[in-house]
Structures are given as structure tokens and as C-alpha cells.
């Protein structure tokens, strides 16, 4: 049997849904030479609003 480890849920991540505009978009952000641009296409399931799928 493997040894058990204790996990602390409150460290590093707080569960919950936050509005996209409040957490990811920063209008005054200045790009750096080391920044990487990645794009993904998301297709929402039926009855899911497109802004919620992404």
C-alpha cells in the first residue's frame, strides 16, 4: 500500500467561477519578447452560450 499524503486545497488555487473579463483581460499589459501567443478554437455544446464555453 502506498503512503498517503495530506493535500491542502486552499494553497495555490481557489475554486469558483469568475467572469472572464475580470480575470484574463488586462488592457494595459505590455508584451515581452518571451511571451507566447496560443490560439484555440472552442465549439460550445448545444444550449451553452459561446462566451461560457471559452
Swiss-Prot record:
MF terms in GO: monooxygenase activity; ribulose-bisphosphate carboxylase activity
A Gene Ontology cellular-component term: chloroplast
GO-annotated biological processes: photorespiration; reductive pentose-phosphate cycle
EC numbers, comma separated: 4.1.1.39
Domain of life of the source: Eukaryota
Subunit structure and binding partners: Heterohexadecamer of 8 large chains and 8 small chains.
Family of the protein in this entry: Belongs to the RuBisCO large chain family. Type I subfamily.
Protein name: Ribulose bisphosphate carboxylase large chain
Gene name per UniProt: rbcL
